[in-house]
Amino acid sequence: VAGRFAPRSTPGTGAPGGGSGSPTTRTTVRGGHVPVPAARRAAADGTADMRQRSWTPPEGHGPLDLGLVLGPLRRGPADPCFRAGRDGSVWRTCLTPLGPGTLRVRASGPAAEAQAWGPGAAWLLDELPALLGAEDDPAAFVPRHRLLAHCAHRRPGLRLTRTGRVLESLIPSVLEQKVTTDEAYRAWRLLVRRYGVPAPGPGPEAGMPDLYVMPEPRTWALIPSWEWHRAGVDDKRAATILRAVRVARRLEEAVTMPPPQARARLELVPGIGPWTSAEVIQRSHGAPDEVTVGDLHLPHIVGYALAGDRDADDAAMLRLLEPYAGQRHRAARLILLSGHAPPRRRPKMRRTDISKW
């Protein structure tokens, strides 16, 4: 499901249009909500290779809420590929089909002002509308529960992003398999900073964060076994990533397929199952019906929110979401964003740092 657990932030820092008076909790962050401060005057960029684009959503699009739309792409508060700036901008790096690129996007009234750098700049700007949810249709969602109606009303800026890239969501999703989110975030951060490339852009003097572009498939394939171990990644997850990067081109082709066929292609790779494929397709395709199954917490949260059943399993969750066929992922995200989760009654999953073995 979009987003993962992160520390609580101070109440009143919610994204514009997303109920800014509500605190950001672990559950709402898991729903894909990244606090983005109100926009301020932008700093001078001062770089010759910058490309720019302004995009205004069509009438009826709703408010442009960068924190809600782009939040699912962040892998922890120190993600080396994603950062929310103090000036209200969002920075994101991407290994595009044309090469590395850096995107900075900022809401300016009803419009989005974007700048991009690097070989992938043109591709990033071409894909900007899809990234900001232009291909999503929130009107197709009809709430059948009071909780969902309330949350949808409070989050009018919720649109599903479509990145058009597979590997950038697949690798961190594999790292999140069967471990705590802190462990997965740490592994992603260490591996990207060590084997990725510094993000193209104007540099820190223009307010650019210290960002990296994820490694190319060949670079992932050449990471030594001891470096996976040092990052806390066990052999099973490392082997899954290595199998995936060997067929990276075929996996990236999945963005041209309908979501069910795309998931089937991803699941041909041993180690990639329904949980991982759903996490990827939600982001790469902006697919509103790709609900995550096999998750440790989501069935309990959905069951508790819709039926008061904190012990619901996947089958019960899917039954409860049947009225939202075609929009089940959106329904699950709204539930997570509502913060309506069962009280914890057992300890958190124990963290196991295999790098110390």
Report the location of each language-model feature.
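Low-acidity, Ser/Thr- and Arg-rich intrinsically disordered low-complexity segments
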Residues: 4-26, 30
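HhH-family (HhH-GPD) DNA N-glycosylase catalytic core used in base-excision repair
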Residues: 30-357
